[in-house]
Structure formats: C-alpha cells, structure tokens
C-alpha cells in the first residue's frame, strides 16, 4: 500500500556498443515491474543518461545519469587500489586517481556526458504518472577536482535536447520550455 511504488535498478550493461542505450534485459525487466504494479522504475549505473519511456501509466527512466560524481575526492581506497597502480599504501587518493586516469586523459572523467544530467519530478494522477518535469543540472567538469562533482541547476538546455533524442526510440516525446523538459 503506497501512493507511489518506485523500483531502483543499478545496471551498467549496454544496448549494443552504446552506453546511453539500455540492454534488452533491462527494458524487459523495467516493463515487467510496471506490469507488476510499480509506478516508476529508476535506472542508474552507466553514469550517463538513457531514454525515458511512458509505459502502461508508469514511467521508466532507463538511467538518470549522475547526480553526484565525486570519485576523485574519496578519502580512502582499499589496499589493492594502491597496489594496482604501484603506489605506497600511504599515498594520497588523488595520486591513485591521477594514475588511473593518466592525469585526466582517459576514463569516465573525460566523458562530458557524465558531468550533466537531470533532476526528474512528476505528479500522480489517479494512481498513474502525470506530467514529468526534467530540470537540467551540471556537475561542473571544468572545475578543479576538489570542487567538481556536486550538482547545480543550469540554464544550458543541451542535456535536454540530447535526452529528447534518447527518448525517441521508446516513443516518448520530450518538449522543452523555459529551460525545463516535459514528458
């Protein structure tokens, strides 16, 4: 008994070679969750946005991307992390991150798509998902390591236009008005 039943699924698996396309099993699973009574399925894991689908009165967010992205600012890592990069056990985490990313030239941190996302909110109407609003956020890839990764609303609509394209294969139309996406 709930006003809104939400299912959270963490999935890195790709649809083909594209990180922004969900694997087929995820589509099947998410739809089965709605069929079983969930109102919303919230996907996360690939660090990038994936499309949104309205399905049988529910909403499926195949991935909402990153809301926070502070991999480089953790205070501790396990011993094998330091061993992997040939660093002493008392090395700073940042030194390990620099080794892992080859000084910021490879890995997730160089992908601009992991540094922007949306905050989704919706209304409920007679037990079904009503209007979905999508507020674009930035995690400030351009800032120094110690300041990036925290979300802030942005007026840049680029992420909304990209998300609109990702929604099309699911038959979902995303419109943009005054810096907010609507589904």
What would you call each of these model-derived segments?
Residues 1-18:
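Short acidic, glycine-rich surface-loop motifs adjacent to enzyme active sites
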Residues 16, 51, 70-71, 130-131, ...:
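Short active-site-adjacent structural elements
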Residues 2, 56-58, 129:
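Short coil/turn connectors at secondary-structure junctions
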Residues 6, 62, 122:
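Conserved, mostly hydrophobic/aromatic
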Residues 21-118:
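Conserved beta-sheet core of the metallophosphoesterase superfamily
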Residues 10-14, 47, 65-67, 137:
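Active-site beta-loop-alpha junctions enriched in small/polar residues
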Residues 76-183:
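A short C-terminal boundary segment appended to hydrolase-like catalytic domains
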